[in-house]
A protein has these predicted regions:
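RNA pseudouridine synthases
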Residues: 1-185, 189-191, 296-300
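Short, P/G- and charge-enriched loop/turn segments at secondary-structure junctions
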Residues: 78, 198-203, 261-265
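Conserved hydrophobic positions within beta-strands
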Residues: 82, 175, 213-216, 249
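Active-site flanking residues adjacent to catalytic metal/cofactor-binding acidic residues
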Residues: 92, 240, 251
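The conserved catalytic core of RNA pseudouridine synthases
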Residues: 128-160, 167-168, 172, 187, ...
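A short, aromatic/hydrophobic, helix- or strand-capping loop or linear motif
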Residues: 31, 202, 254
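Conserved "cap/hinge" positions at secondary-structure junctions
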Residues: 46, 65, 240, 258-259
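RNA substrate-recognition surfaces in RNA-acting enzymes
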Residues: 250-281, 287
Length: 308
């Protein structure tokens, strides 16, 4: 495959090579670019470099695109709870326990498999074969609303809104214990946990700014029901921030320790994405959608004792 040669402009002096390439090739994900670097397909002045290499002005970068891997994600007739749909996008209410997109070792029964059956070829291709239409994600064991793009125009416009933090995203969660304040704003950067790379953590190292607003709606014996609104959308943000405050989400095996059989029965965090708002990419109209608390959530809080 032919290589691509480019020279680093002065504005990118000191910028990491992987970040630079993600700007030059906006349709490639950062993880795809990092894989190309790790495979030796990126060189600077004739020498292969690590993904954290920092560029200098006028250095010559050569990129050899990775050979495409032929992956076929099959369409599956899995029921979808579609809240809204038009020619550009759809809003889906994802159930707890469903993975959003395929990944190594898990290529079936995901939201993407269901979308491929429902939408056929009408999904954006920006995020590649494994993530068609996927603009943003919520965790497997988080239920609630997701936006799916049907074409690249919509995908780019929605992605820009996410980048600008102009999406409205509101969640409900049950957390362990009672918070000191009835409402608050958590401003704490989130990055990979240096001791466990599979987890995120509040850290100053290689982290991104993260802001979560919360309001206590009701207190139960040993638990609290919260409304949370995101200003940013980092991986596991709500789960990490609540654990950081000392009040992990009920049922969260990763950032907390489920204490009761009722928590264990949740099979993951008691967290629901109940509201999402955005500007429609084609009409420029603000749209907002809500989702009622699902059965697992209602059942859990129904078994709690309200604090008087």
């Amino acid at each position: 495959m032919n290589s691509i040669s480019i020279f680093a402009d002065s504005e990118f002096d000191g910028v990491r090579i992987d970040k630079y390439l993600s700007v030059v090739f906006p349709d490639l994900s950062r993880s795809f670019i990092q894989k190309a670097i790790d495979c030796g397909n990126v060189s600077v002045n004739g020498k292969t470099v690590a993904k954290n290499y920092k560029l200098k002005t006028d250095e010559r970068i050569e990129y050899i695109p990775l050979e495409p891997v032929k992956l076929e994600v099959k369409a599956q007739n899995i029921p979808l709870d579609i809240v809204y749909e038009d020619d550009d996008l759809l809003v889906v209410n994802k159930p707890k326990g469903m993975v959003v997109h395929p990944a190594p070792g898990n290529y079936e029964n995901t939201l993407v498999n269901a979308l491929l059956f429902h939408c056929k070829d009408s999904l954006s291709g920006i995020n590649g074969v494994l993530r068609p239409g996927i603009v943003h994600r919520i965790d497997k064991d988080t239920s609630g609303l997701l936006i799916v793009a049907k074409n690249d125009f919509s995908h780019r416009a929605l992605a820009e809104q996410i980048k600008a933090h102009s999406f409205t995203r509101e969640y409900r969660a049950v957390t362990i214990g009672h918070l000191k304040e009835s409402s608050g704003r958590v401003v704490a950067p989130i990055g990979r946990n240096p001791k466990d790379r599979k987890k995120m953590a509040v850290t100053d190292k290689n982290s991104k700014n993260a802001v979560t607003n919360y309001e206590v709606l009701r207190e139960y014996r040993g638990y609290s029901l919260l409304k949370l609104r995101l200003e940013t959308g980092r991986t596991h943000q709500i789960r990490v921030h609540m654990a950081y405050l000392g009040h992990p989400i009920a049922g969260d095996f990763v950032y907390g320790t489920p204490r009761t059989k009722e928590e264990l029965a949740l099979n993951g965090q008691c967290l629901h994405a109940g509201l999402i708002g955005f500007i429609h990419p084609r009409t420029n109209e603000y749209l907002e959608f809500t989702s009622d608390l699902p059965l697992y959530f209602k059942k859990f809080i129904g078994g709690l004792t309200v604090d008087e």
